[in-house]
């Protein structure tokens, strides 16, 4: 039995910023769904440009069969250099879910993907390697009906920094995963899970996000014939 993917993404802009510095691309191939989350350095217009370029480059090259090395090299050569910091920087996660349930996950400097089965967090066995001097994590695994995969930008794990509440040093990944796990047990909807996680981030930020905050939720459901 094949699977299909119910995907929802939602973002909170950094307080007072018009543009979001995170970009999400959802693409389809003949046999898979590809989800890309890119987070540009900083915030506002510059971050938006960095993340948009990164997501578009990864999506276009990935779909055309380019290797991961070729994708990363192109990003490094293409992104505009920040005049202040003298670097071009954007983090990213790539999640490719095949119709047969196979998954390929690539992560560069983003918070770890949260993988849930029966509402419980499952640790993923990842392999790290250097690609153009950047440490990239890769993972291949199998999903089944009812599983959920959650990608987040670091605005989620930074929620609460500088505030006086419980998470004044940030919202730990483990606590984020626990929250998502509880949501997964009570809802089969990716939209509800994404909305709940974003709402919780906003509450922790006291309504004034200190960073661009993006959540992507992918629920695995039965593949239905058209």
Residue spans for each PLM region:
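Regulatory cytosolic signal-relay segments
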Residues: 1-18
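Acidic loop->beta-strand submotif enriched in PP2C/PPM serine/threonine phosphatases
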Residues: 17-30, 123-162
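Primarily the active-site beta-strand->alpha-helix module of PP2C/PPM metal-dependent phosphatases
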Residues: 23-78, 142, 150, 162-177
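DG-centered beta-turn motif at the end of beta-strands
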Residues: 39-40, 110, 148-156, 212
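Short helix/loop capping segments that flank catalytic or ligand/cofactor-binding pockets
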Residues: 45-47, 116, 152, 159-161, ...
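Catalytic core of PPM/PP2C metal-dependent serine/threonine phosphatase domains
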Residues: 49-119, 129, 136, 186-223
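Small-residue (GG/TT-enriched) beta-loop-alpha framework at ligand/catalytic clefts
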Residues: 92, 101, 114-143, 149, ...
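Juxtadomain coupling helices with adjacent low-complexity linkers
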Residues: 121, 158-195, 200
């Amino acid at each position: 039995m094949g699977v299909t993917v119910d995907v929802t993404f939602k973002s909170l802009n950094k307080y007072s910023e018009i543009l979001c510095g995170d970009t999400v691309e959802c693409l389809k191939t003949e046999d898979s769904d590809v989800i890309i989350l890119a987070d540009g350095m900083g915030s506002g217009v510059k971050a938006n440009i960095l993340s948009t370029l990164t997501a578009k480059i990864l999506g276009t090259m990935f779909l055309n069969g380019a290797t991961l090395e070729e994708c990363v090299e192109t990003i490094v050569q293409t992104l505009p250099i920040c005049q202040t910091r003298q670097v071009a920087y954007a983090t990213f996660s790539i999640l490719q879910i095949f119709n047969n349930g196979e998954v390929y996950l690539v992560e560069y400097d983003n918070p770890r993907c949260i993988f849930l089965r029966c509402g419980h967090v499952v640790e993923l066995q990842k392999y790290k390697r250097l690609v153009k001097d950047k440490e990239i994590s890769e993972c291949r695994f199998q999903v089944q009906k009812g599983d959920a995969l959650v990608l987040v930008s670091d605005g989620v794990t930074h929620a609460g920094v500088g505030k006086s509440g419980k998470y004044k040093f940030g919202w730990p990944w483990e606590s984020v995963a626990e929250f998502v796990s509880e949501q997964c047990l009570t809802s089969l909807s990716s939209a509800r899970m994404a909305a709940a996680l974003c709402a919780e981030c906003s509450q922790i930020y006291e309504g004034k996000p200190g960073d661009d905050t993006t959540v992507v939720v992918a629920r695995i459901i039965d593949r239905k014939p058209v």
